[in-house]
Amino acid sequence: MSRLATRFGQLKSQQRKALVSYVMAGDPHPQVTVPLLHQMVEAGVDVIELGLPFSDPMADGPVIALAAERALAGGTNTLDALNMVKEFRQKDQETPVVLMGYLNPVEVIGYEKFVSTAHACGVDGILLVDLPPEEAAELDVVLKQFDMDQIFLLAPTSTDERIKHVVKQASGFIYYVSLKGVTGAATLDVAEAANRIAKIKAETDIPVGVGFGISDATSAKAMGGVADAVIVGSAFVKPFATL
């Protein structure tokens, strides 16, 4: 059983929801990332979402876009991020780590090399924001060879047919984007998100996590009432800039 499946199973038996925290690899400088990951786990984070720095993060708002800029300026690249996971695994073999990023750096490295290296370093899954399921078959074949999960996005605009299509291909968990916009944007509509999540959960047993717009304890608690995981990005990343 994968680390993600094990963790979600443990939380379900404890009647708890997962706290998934995003951190940009190498932000604000490379030496901070691994100690920060351990501190996050000690503080109660259940799943780590490690951002891969990219120069054109089209789905990210200003907070995470600036984090990517700082990481790139500090010299962190995709392979460096994988090595950070490898170092993290020297002390933590249990906390799931999911990579979140964009397709271009992965294609540059090559699917086989990227996935095999990520697996060897202790990565559990990947979410590429700009890779839709219709174009993900080649990567999926390689991920399955290494028992790694491929996570996909669903949004408020996703049709019922789209939901059915995506849940058939996803593994690990479904990432529901609760807002129409970039990360860290706007105000969360809890009622709409709850309705959409219910539709997704009616189609699959895969856990559903909610991200985008989770900015405080109130919104996290509200989403934890309807989803299996609460994903916090910008609200955590913003103070990291001062480390």
Stretch-by-stretch model annotation:
Residues 44, 118-124, 142-150, 168-176, ...:
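Glycine-enriched alpha-helix->loop->beta-strand junction motifs that scaffold or abut catalytic
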Residues 30-41, 158-168, 210, 214-230:
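Catalytic cores of alpha/beta
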Residues 21, 40, 51, 118, ...:
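Conserved, mostly hydrophobic/aromatic
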Residues 19-23, 48-50, 97-101, 126-128, ...:
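Hydrophobic faces of well-ordered beta-strands that scaffold small-molecule active sites
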Residues 45-55, 123-127, 132-135, 176-184, ...:
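Glycine-rich phosphate-binding active-site loops on the catalytic face of alpha/beta enzymes
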Residues 191-231, 235-239:
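A C-terminal functional module that forms or caps the active site or interfaces directly
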Residues 6-28, 61-67, 88-100:
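N-terminal small/glycine-rich loop or linker at the start of catalytic domains
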Residues 1-11, 30, 55-66, 73-86, ...:
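Active-site-adjacent beta->alpha loops and helix N-cap segments on the catalytic face
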